[in-house]
Amino acid sequence: RNGTLLTSESGNRYEVVSLLGAGGQGEVYDVQCNGRHYALKWYFKGSATARQKNILETIIAKGSPDASFLWPMELIVPAQGDLYGYIMPLRPKNYKSIVDLMKKRVNPSFYTLCRTAFNLTRGYQKLHAMGAKYQDISFGNLFFNPDNGDVLICDNDNVSFDNSKPGGVLGTP
């Protein structure tokens, strides 16, 4: 709920500002801490498993491969209940989804498209170079700045650093 106060495992206090959206695993909220806005992914009951929490703890400990990933930063685990979530950077509003491109809601230059492709490839290469794999590639998880081709890759809570099977999602078939 808007106005709800949550404390992270590291002691930071976040206030829920508004619901941004929902997916198969949970809801994403705009939250605020010390005057800065972040995104909070809050898991639904069926997705808030011990396995998913272990995956998140590993991802947070390893750190982001680079700034193109909206990487989990810290966990929010209330003292009561089985549900939890994590904090990540908030995507700037000027970034558009690949779906926006496919539906022609944005019309970047050919140069920007090439830079977007290069930056996506470079981001995944950096992820793989640190021994990880991204397990949720879908059109809704890739964003780009239509002015310069910078990219943001979200939904990184299913990244794996071992040979485990995918978590709760399988990406785009």
Spans of features found by a protein language model:
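Conserved hydrophobic "DFG−1" position in protein kinase catalytic cores
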Residues: 30, 90, 144-145
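Conserved structural core of kinase catalytic domains
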Residues: 70-116
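Conserved alphaE helix
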Residues: 110-129
